[in-house]
């Protein structure tokens, strides 16, 4: 984890990406690029947005800085303080809770030795509670970085975290082998006819 920088500027690669993002919007509507630019700045800055990065985005878009702060503080996808290398976001909203997210939270607490809003002493893991990650049919689930881990139970959640601890890359997606968001027992409709057509 790093401290707050004194200044922020996009590196050469991200400056080109920022120009391309801004160019997607009509003249006069460049402020619409605020969310992707904040994401780009956050990715460049080890997963969090210091005030200087938000100010830089405001300058690029010709927006008052307060408008950028409003966006960054409203959406939970933006982190306003340093986070660990692996940001473990556990969904505890109703569908995940009904399917056992309390067990996932417990497994994460036990495996990582931290609670929501905390970072491990080695700076490797930050744990956050989220309201909804949009994969309700595959509940319970958690997001780590850009990857979704779905159809979890306490054992699979623990296995994912242990693999990350050892430097491995756990397989994202359903942990029960479910294909995307099909019913857990497999397709019940839209099956091929008996003739194979």
For the regions a protein language model found, what residue spans apply to each?
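Signature of N-terminal electron-transfer/Fe-S-associated modules in redox systems
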Residues: 1-197
């Amino acid at each position: 984890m790093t401290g707050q920088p004194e200044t922020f500027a996009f590196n050469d690669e991200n400056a080109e990406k920022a120009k391309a993002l801004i160019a997607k919007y009509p003249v006069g509507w460049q402020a619409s690029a605020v969310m992707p630019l904040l994401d780009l700045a956050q990715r460049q800055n080890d997963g969090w947005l210091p005030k200087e990065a938000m100010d830089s985005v405001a300058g690029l878009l010709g927006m008052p800085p307060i408008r950028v702060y409003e966006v960054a503080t409203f959406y939970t996808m933006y982190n306003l303080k340093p986070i660990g290398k692996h940001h473990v976001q556990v969904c505890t909203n109703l569908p995940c809770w009904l399917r056992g997210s309390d067990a996932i939270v417990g497994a994460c607490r036990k495996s990582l030795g931290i609670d929501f809003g905390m970072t491990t002493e080695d700076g490797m893991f930050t744990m956050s509670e989220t309201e909804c990650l949009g994969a309700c049919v595959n509940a319970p689930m958690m997001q780590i970085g850009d990857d979704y881990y779905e159809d979890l139970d306490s054992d699979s959640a623990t296995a994912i975290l242990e693999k990350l601890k050892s430097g491995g890359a756990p397989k994202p997606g359903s942990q029960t082998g479910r294909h995307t968001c099909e019913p857990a027992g497999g397709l019940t409709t839209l099956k091929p006819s008996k003739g194979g057509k």
